[in-house]
């Protein structure tokens, strides 16, 4: 893709959404940072643009045309043929834009993405941005990993039927003869739904309706390093025609915490593993499947069976590989840097030396709103992965000040309400978590 820095933030008014005045080439997905050798480019903070073209065949007329971004760090404004079609804040989860009425069929269309990597105390992860005497901006993270930025995951152009499957969720129960899968399907139309479960090419269970139960005899269970996946097929029918078909791979398993032990399918499992990062040399945090595969092989070699997605939700492909490899995941929302002592140190003693909790500031309501949005998006995306066994809601936050309970409680309640499988909710504590 074409790429250009926009340090004066003049691109929107100057018409850069239609054509960049000058540009470099930039691979996607990738962070831009480590692709440069000069310090100013590597540590650039502010607006920057991507530009490319895509073709929409005439045969797609009558379908909904949707652009889906795996992640853009940290803020994105998306333009198609110069028209703004989406805005998104949050650098670690997907978002989409419906462009059905914007695209031109049977010809090329211009896609432009304005990205911003500045940090603030109302965003996840937290930080601040300073402006130097020469006008340059510099990011001051409250977190201890590099502030990589760019289009980090794949971008998809999709043609979708007008009536389609929007979402589904599952819950599992083991029985004496196998397993039962309670499901819920949401669609955007009135036509009937069928749900089938396949083991290879053999159909092993079926049901109908947007809610129901699949009864699986002699079910093969998903387990640590012994993953077994079934194909779940959801269809919408209009008479004899299939309006939409959605396929996903699921694993049958149960989990609970009892007497201080984690039980998977009723048997205790000791969690051994890591808090990881997606970072790698050259491409930064951009998705790179060979590196992902190598990381999984290293974890197996060392005897691990679990990892925490420190400190943000990872690319969907990593969860799919964990499903296939039989790894357990503690899925973490990017709530990191919520420590006032860190904020004071890195942001030039905010609060003028007064002892102040991180969650008792004027920025707290906006932060909590963004935190809830990120948590909702993470659970919506990852709730059907058999590998995901817990939600991590914060990493090393200040947890002893007056506003802590008021901030934490709605997050834990929200996670409980959103997750049909009622996974454990957790957060990581730092021993120095005082103001």
What does each model-found stretch correspond to?
Residues 93-95, 255, 313-316, 419, ...:
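Short acidic loop-to-helix transition motifs that present clustered carboxylates
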Residues 398, 406-435:
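Extracellular glycoside hydrolase catalytic/binding regions
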Residues 116-123, 238-243, 266:
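Short acidic/polar inter-strand loop motif in beta-rich domains
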Residues 32-56, 60-68, 73-89, 154, ...:
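Active-site-adjacent substrate/metal-binding segments within catalytic domains
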Residues 2-47, 113-161, 260, 337-346, ...:
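Core domains of carbohydrate- and sulfate-ester-processing enzymes
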Residues 158-189:
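Surface beta-strand/loop "capping" patches
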Residues 104-108, 184-258:
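Extended acidic/polar, glycine-enriched regions
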Residues 3-6, 45-164, 189-190, 202, ...:
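Accessory beta-strand-rich segments of carbohydrate-active enzymes
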């Amino acid at each position: 893709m074409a790429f250009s820095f926009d340090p004066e933030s003049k691109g929107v008014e100057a018409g850069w959404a239609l054509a960049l005045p000058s540009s470099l080439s930039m691979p996607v997905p990738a962070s831009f940072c480590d692709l440069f050798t000069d310090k100013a480019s590597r540590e650039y903070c502010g607006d920057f643009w991507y530009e490319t073209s895509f073709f929409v065949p005439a045969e797609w007329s009558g379908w909904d045309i949707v652009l889906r971004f795996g992640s853009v760090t940290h803020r994105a404004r998306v333009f198609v043929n110069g028209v703004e079609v989406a805005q998104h804040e949050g650098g670690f989860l997907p978002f989409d834009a419906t462009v059905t009425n914007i695209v031109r069929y049977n010809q090329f269309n211009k896609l432009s993405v304005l990205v911003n990597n500045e940090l603030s105390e109302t965003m996840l992860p937290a930080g601040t941005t300073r402006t130097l005497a020469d006008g340059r901006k510099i990011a001051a993270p409250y977190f201890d990993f590099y502030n990589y930025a760019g289009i980090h995951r794949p971008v998809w152009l999709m043609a979708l039927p007008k009536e389609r499957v929007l979402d589904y969720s599952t819950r599992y129960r083991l029985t004496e003869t196998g397993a039962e899968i309670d499901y819920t399907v949401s669609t955007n139309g009135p036509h009937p739904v069928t749900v089938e479960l396949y083991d290879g090419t053999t159909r092993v269970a079926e049901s109908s309706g947007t809610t129901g139960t699949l009864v699986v005899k002699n079910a093969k269970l998903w387990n640590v390093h012994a993953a077994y996946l079934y194909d779940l097929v959801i269809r919408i029918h209009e008479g004899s025609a299939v309006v939409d078909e959605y396929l996903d791979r699921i694993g049958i398993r149960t989990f609970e915490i009892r007497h201080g032990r984690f039980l998977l399918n009723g048997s205790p499992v000791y969690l051994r593993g890591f808090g990881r990062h997606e970072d790698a040399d050259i491409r930064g945090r951009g998705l790179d499947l060979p590196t992902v595969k190598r990381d999984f092989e290293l974890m197996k070699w060392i005897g691990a069976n679990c990892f925490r997605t420190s400190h943000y939700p990872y690319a969907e492909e990593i969860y799919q590989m964990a499903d296939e490899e039989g790894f357990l995941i503690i899925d973490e929302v990017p709530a990191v840097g919520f420590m006032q002592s860190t904020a004071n140190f890195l942001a030039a003693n905010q609060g003028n030396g007064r002892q102040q909790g991180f969650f008792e500031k004027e920025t707290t309501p906006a932060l909590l709103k963004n935190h809830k949005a990120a948590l909702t998006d993470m659970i919506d995306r990852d709730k059907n992965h058999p590998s995901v066994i817990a939600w991590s809601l914060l990493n090393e936050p200040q947890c002893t000040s007056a506003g802590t309970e008021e901030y934490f409680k709605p997050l834990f309640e929200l996670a409980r309400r959103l997750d049909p499988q009622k996974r454990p909710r957790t957060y990581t504590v730092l021993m120095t978590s005082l103001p």
